[in-house]
From Swiss-Prot:
It comes from Serratia proteamaculans (strain 568). This is ADP-L-glycero-D-manno-heptose-6-epimerase. Binds 1 NADP(+) per subunit. One of its GO terms (biological process) is carbohydrate metabolic process. Substrate binds at residues 168, 179, 186, 200-203, 208, 271. Belongs to the NAD(P)-dependent epimerase/dehydratase family. HldD subfamily. HAMAP family: Heptose_epimerase (MF_01601).
Length: 309
């Protein structure tokens, strides 16, 4: 059995799809379906069972026998970069992850988890080393602190621990994310409502490393198969502008002209204007598959999104 926490979320459900595509279906999904709309991410997937996050955490803390576990993909977290309840964030992202990590270490279960490029903050180099890490928000801090915790354990660990610093992930199964959904998702919605797509002032200068969620799932499955441990950037190694995303969406729809809107005051000083994954460690680990460009990934995503709308 493989356990996927956050399995009804965007990355978790895409990992399940990738597992299904290999013929694997013995999957336990852990999530919180208080937001019932997330069920839609699981409808076309084959899983063995579902358990609520709180019940699962209780099982983990109690050390319950959950059966034979081949691996845990830990994608469940509060991923809102605008959430400032630090106690909630640390309980949900840090303590929960520690409890799960120790459960896996005690049983030598491979543990693959979601970190984030938010650990880097406003730096201009994105290398998986302490001197490049300075998160801008409590979400980024919660991810950074768990990475630090993992670094202390890695040298002595007798089973796989692998963290992925996801950059700007976009693609299928993110419709439940609201304001945290990708720019491509929002621009598509604006065009479908008969509006012009909107970008913040300065978007031609903001560059991010946008990675297609199918590529993220492929990275996760490759590392499980390889057994490699460590903390790795999960991006394309290319920084592309928000304008490039908008151009790809407009190109798909063949209509709409980009409008600029004022940059929100609440994001000033807390916004990553530039991200670009350094892939040196990822490639050195042996992962050599190519990553979709924005033009390629957004085109595929738009076809999926408008087919399922």
């Amino acid at each position: 059995m493989i356990i996927v926490t956050g399995g009804a979320g965007m990355i978790g459900s895409n990992i399940i799809k990738a597992l299904n595509d290999t013929g694997y279906r013995d999957i336990l999904v852990v999530d919180n379906l208080k937001d019932g709309t997330k069920f839609a991410n699981l409808v076309d997937l084959d899983i063995a069972d579902y358990i609520d996050k709180e019940d699962f955490i209780a099982n983990i803390i109690a050390g319950d026998d959950l059966g034979e576990i081949d691996a845990i993909f830990h994608e469940g977290a509060c991923s809102s970069t605008t959430e400032w309840d630090g106690k909630y964030m640390m309980d949900n992202n840090y303590q929960y992850s520690k409890d799960l990590l120790h459960y896996c270490l005690d049983r030598e279960i491979p543990f693959l988890y979601a970190s984030s490029a938010a650990t880097y903050g406003g730096r201009e180099e994105f290398i998986e080393e302490r001197q490049f890490e300075a998160p801008l928000n409590v979400y980024g801090y919660s991810k950074f602190l768990f990475d630090q915790y993992v670094r202390e354990i890695l040298p002595e660990a007798e089973s796989q621990i692998c963290g992925f610093r996801y950059f700007n992930v976009y693609g299928p199964r993110e419709g439940h994310k609201g304001s945290m959904a990708s720019v491509a998702f929002h621009l598509n919605g604006q065009i479908n409502r008969g509006e012009n797509p909107k970008l913040f002032d300065g978007s031609q200068d903001f560059k991010r490393d946008f990675i297609y969620v199918g590529d993220v799932a492929a990275v996760n499955l490759w590392f499980l198969k390889s057994g490699v441990s460590g903390i790795f950037n999960c991006g394309t190694g290319r920084a592309e502008t928000f304008q490039a995303v908008a151009d790809a969406v407009v190109d798909f729809h063949q209509k709409g002209a980009v409008e600029n809107i004022p940059f929100p005051e609440k994001l000033k000083g807390r916004y990553q204007a530039f991200t670009q994954a350094d892939l040196t460690k990822l490639r050195a680990a042996g992962y050599d598959a190519p990553f979709k460009t924005v033009a390629e990934g957004v085109k595929e995503y738009m076809a999926w999104l408008n087919r399922t709308a």
